[in-house]
Amino acid sequence: LMYYTLPRPV
């Protein structure tokens, strides 16, 4: 799972 590895918008 590479969902948390993506740059999340802050």
UniProtKB/Swiss-Prot annotation:
Tissue expression notes: Expressed by the skin glands.
Principal localization?
secreted
Q: Which UniProt keywords apply?
A: Amidation, Secreted
| GO terms under cellular component | extracellular region
Q: Which residues carry this modification: Valine amide?
A: V10
Subcellular compartments = Secreted
This protein is called what? Peptide TRP-J1
